[in-house]
Amino acid sequence: MSSIGTGYDLSVTTFSPDGRVFQIEYAAKAVDNSGTAVGIKCKDGIVLGVEKLIQSKMMLPGSNRRIHSVHRHSGMAVAGLAADGRQIVARAKSEATNYESVYGEAVPVKELADRVASYVHLCTLYWWLRPFGCGVILGGYDRDGPQLYMVEPSGISYRYFGAAIGKGKQAAKTEIEKLKLSEMTCREGIIEVAKIIYKVHDEAKDKAFELEMSWICDESKREHQKVPDNLLQEAKAAATAALEEMDAD
């Protein structure tokens, strides 16, 4: 970065001469160094998957979760600094609870995404704060059907058919674009997301990983739940077989 060391990267409130805010770019870099998180919108719901890198062999399986429930009908996948992600999840839960207490119904996914994005953006406006070093994929089911959003460290949010963040995001996006999501069920989507995460994982450079998955669909009664173990094992087996077949070619 051309302006490193010249003082333009010392505060989130300082623009460089070419219009960049380096603190936000550094936060985005923290996300890019994280395990890959993928979300897809299928015809009957949302599937979220995360490549959770295992930092130590002594860690218990299932610890330091990267996928969290925000509300009955919405969930969030986190890439980047896990502690920052927990703070965003806590804020999202608070916003969802507050909306329901005021309006008497579950918060729409778009409203929740906008509120989370505004909170993330707030931390890019004042010199005594730092940007969140994480990005999140938010999936949910409301009166408009299944919806998928991604919130970046800059505080911007977009609605997607399929989204990916983290170390393997470019390769994951390429694979997502090949899928016919409008014709795919969540059961099929679970297998495809597992295949994508296994494919983008670099065994030579990356640590071992744990596949974490959840869904919000008609089969889960439109509630955010972990993918059942039998379906998760089936997806892992299909992903491993696809990877071995690709290596054989």
UniProtKB/Swiss-Prot annotation:
Keywords: Cytoplasm, Nucleus, Proteasome. GO terms for biological process: proteasome-mediated ubiquitin-dependent protein catabolic process. SMART domains: Proteasome_A_N (SM00948). This is Proteasome subunit alpha type-3. The 26S proteasome consists of a 20S proteasome core and two 19S regulatory subunits. The 20S proteasome core is composed of 28 subunits that are arranged in four stacked rings, resulting in a barrel-shaped structure. The two end rings are each formed by seven alpha subunits, and the two central rings are each formed by seven beta subunits. The catalytic chamber with the active sites is on the inside of the barrel. The proteasome is a multicatalytic proteinase complex which is characterized by its ability to cleave peptides with Arg, Phe, Tyr, Leu, and Glu adjacent to the leaving group at neutral or slightly basic pH. The proteasome has an ATP-dependent proteolytic activity. The keyword Iron does not apply. It is found in: Cytoplasm; Nucleus. It holds the Pfam family Proteasome. One of its GO terms (cellular component) is proteasome core complex, alpha-subunit complex. The keyword Nucleus applies. It comes from the Eukaryota. It comes from Spinacia oleracea. PANTHER family: PROTEASOME SUBUNIT ALPHA/BETA (PTHR11599). Belongs to the peptidase T1A family.
